[in-house]
Amino acid sequence: MYGSARTITNLEGSPSRSPRLPRSPRLGHRRTSSGGGGGTGKTLSMENIQSLNAAYATSGPMYLSDHEGVASTTYPKGTMTLGRATNRAVYGGRVTAMGSSPNIASAGLSHTDVLSYTDQHGGLTGSSHHHHHQVPSMLRQVRDSTMLDLQAQLKELQRENDLLRKELDIKDSKLGSSMNSIKTFWSPELKKERVLRKEEAARMSVLKEQMRVSHEENQHLQLTIQALQDELRTQRDLNHLLQQESGNRGAEHFTIELTEENFRRLQAEHDRQAKELFLLRKTLEEMELRIETQKQTLNARDESIKKLLEMLQSKGLPSKSLEDDNERTRRMAEAESQVSHLEVILDQKEKENIHLREELHRRSQLQPEPAKTKALQTVIEMKDTKIASLERNIRDLEDEIQMLKANGVLNTEDREEEIKQIEVYKSHSKFMKTKIDQLKQELSKKESELLALQTKLETLSNQNSDCKQHIEVLKESLTAKEQRAAILQTEVDALRLRLEEKESFLNKKTKQLQDLTEEKGTLAGEIRDMKDMLEVKERKINVLQKKIENLQEQLRDKDKQLTNLKDRVKSLQTDSSNTDTALATLEEALSEKERIIERLKEQRERDDRERLEEIESFRKENKDLKEKVNALQAELTEKESSLIDLKEHASSLASAGLKRDSKLKSLEIAIEQKKEECSKLEAQLKKAHNIEDDSRMNPEFADQIKQLDKEASYYRDECGKAQAEVDRLLEILKEVENEKNDKDKKIAELESLTLRHMKDQNKKVANLKHNQQLEKKKNAQLLEEVRRREDSMADNSQHLQIEELMNALEKTRQELDATKARLASTQQSLAEKEAHLANLRIERRKQLEEILEMKQEALLAAISEKDANIALLELSASKKKKTQEEVMALKREKDRLVHQLKQQTQNRMKLMADNYDDDHHHYHHHHHHHHHRSPGRSQHSNHRPSPDQDDEEGIWA
């Protein structure tokens, strides 16, 4: 009817109990002990008054620390698993010492899931076994943290054992005092006290058994710690062997996979935490509504308790003069009506309490109880204990009323016994008055304490609302940072893909460059062979020209002889006086001379034919050489176009490098912001620690401090991961810049080769011009000789040969004009290519200047960040070694960055000076372009930025 046992069992069903562990064996004992205090005596016993006094004197709420569990909870030996726990570590339960009476139910200790923290860390170790050969340091840290947590839990269990022993001693002393008081004052209650002693002995045995179980559990935890240490040793040995086997084969690939897996795992944990936070918000709102309803019910209960106390005071004290039976019956009727009304109210309140406890139990199974509900639950339990004591008093009064009715209506003879009992009441009324006064004083104290607690509750609720708002702001910032981290991760993935594409494109270009160099070598060999062929042909032409000159001299001699002979013939004709013999001799001589002339003519015709054949062969060879020269020029144009494409690709790579530098800057700025937020969170943690020192009795601040610690550690991990990702991207950029420098060197080599090739072509063209001029001179001499011979020779064959020679000369002139036009076109294309090269160099200088400016800006930003961090650490005014070491490390990094900034400024000044010299040289080069074309090109092409500048590109802070 009164439901005292139900309230206790609902309290004992601890909402924070782990689902893996069994229920505590103390529950059955509490069920048996809660119903053992039924009202059997006729009057309000002295033992009940003393128990009420002890309860109100010692029933203040006691809070354990955040990680302290109660040692009376029992676990079987095989229930400790190392899987991932779903529940968090529960805050410490409330302990209430309720005096020596078993009639007042003591509230149950909340079951704390001691192994949830070890389960959580065990799950971490289980997940880290999969990548143990990849991340040994992470696994060691996790294992060390689990070992430290287990040792801390062992220490806490030992401390709780000591506390339980102290409680046992206190209960023994209270039992002894209560027994002495019973023996001295109330001998009729000895039988009842024997039963109570038996129950207390049973409780003592249960407590001893629980101590034994906790001791066994401590031993079991020590064994598990030893097993974990053995596992650590074996895993370290395995890790050492795997590291020796794997070596340095795929370190970068593993780190990339690890970071991606860590990122995915962190993302999954973040989603899970977001869901839990959403559920927690909903449950917090519902709990606040429940707390308001409970406050209203508590106010109603306070009023009912005050009424009951007034009734007890009016009922407990008998009047000095005996009144009539009518007045007594009227008082009994009023008391019965009040009791019935109070019973109805109590039933309603108990139903509401049961409903609230069930909802609290259901909510607390989903999440750990907040500190506010714990404080309210302690207040509710105190009120329940008061209500239970008042119920017992009411039952005693009802029994007394029934006895009075029976004695008053049936037995008039027993009035004398009642009068004796009233005298006994009178004798002990003074004692009861003093006790009631003490109870009133204690009630006033408790009311003042309740008011103080209400003010504390209001302040704590205000602080809780502020903390909730701050937590919501932090959560919003967390979501924004996570979104930014996701965006940065997508950008990093896109950069990786683009880097891979650029690397493949660079490999293709290197292959093309190698093919071009090989083709260039083959073409150079062919050109050398052509040069040798040309030299051989020139030697043959020289030999033939010498032969022609010798034949021409012979012809001249023969012409002279002919003229002499003609003169002689004329002289002979004039001398008609010569004899016929002389004429015969002369005719013979003439015939011989004619034969000689015919032979000479035949020999001349043969020589002319041979010369014409050689000229035709030379023409054919000249055509072949021109075709080869045209093919070489086409290949040269193709190679120059490929060079232009390579330069455009190099400029695109430089622009991509600039974009990557800008993205790296944004990443560094994001990292700086995260570091600043971490420093802010650390400052908030320090403030929270100071608040915790001021109010250690409030567990809500401890929860918030823990959450802030977790958030700070999470931000530190995120900062470390982002810093590692930035370092990896910087290394990739370094490699890309080195590859770009190699490509620039290859382009310079190709430019020098093209310049040499163009010089060789210019030399060949000059030699061809010289040879053509010599051929022109020789042809002019031949034409003059032919014209001279035209006067002496009238043969048609000679005229035909002269016409052929004239046609050949015209053809050679046309070929010379064509070669001149080609030379002009090649010179024009060379000038255009030089202008394009100059533009490319100017663009490259601009890009280098922009890169140096960006590096200087990034270094200045990094230096300002280091200054800000140093100022924050100095303002924190903490003289710890870690902060001093951090300040020293930041100063060293700042000095290194300043040194890098000096180097960058020196490089920029060098580049500006080189640009000035190059512009000055370029002006002189254009001024003497027509006179000194090839050396100007060589000097211009050799001017490139030093490789030190290329090596010093990038910020590796």
Swiss-Prot record:
Keyword hit for Phosphoprotein: yes
Domain of life: Eukaryota
Any one GO molecular function term: structural constituent of presynaptic active zone
Bias kind Acidic residues: ranges: 948-957
Phosphoserine modified-residue sites: 65, 666
Composition skew (Polar residues), residue ranges: 1-13
GO BP: maintenance of presynaptic active zone structure; regulation of calcium-dependent activation of synaptic vesicle fusion; regulation of presynaptic cytosolic calcium ion concentration; synaptic vesicle priming
Chain spans, region Disordered: 1-44, 918-957
Disulfide bonds: none
Keyword field contains Cytoplasm: yes
Annotated localization: Cytoplasm; Synapse; Presynaptic active zone; Cytoplasm, Cytoskeleton
Gene3D superfamilies found in the cross-reference section: 1.10.287.1490
Coiled coil regions in record: 140-917
Stored Pfam families: Cast
Stretch forming the signal peptide: none
Biased composition (Basic residues): 922-943
UniProt main location, coarse: cytoplasm
GO cellular component, one term: presynaptic active zone cytoplasmic component
Record keywords, A-Z: Cell projection, Coiled coil, Cytoplasm, Cytoskeleton, Phosphoprotein, Synapse
Job description of the protein: Thought to be involved in the organization of the cytomatrix at the nerve terminals active zone (CAZ) which regulates neurotransmitter release. Seems to act together with BSN. May recruit liprin-alpha proteins to the CAZ.
Complexes and interactors: Interacts with BSN, ERC1, PPFIA1, PPFIA2, PPFIA3 and PPFIA4. Interacts through its C-terminus with the PDZ domain of RIMS1. Part of a complex consisting of ERC2, RIMS1 and UNC13A.
PANTHER family, per the entry: ELKS/RAB6-INTERACTING/CAST PROTEIN, ERC PROTEIN 2
Annotated protein name in UniProt: ERC protein 2
Organism: Homo sapiens (Human)
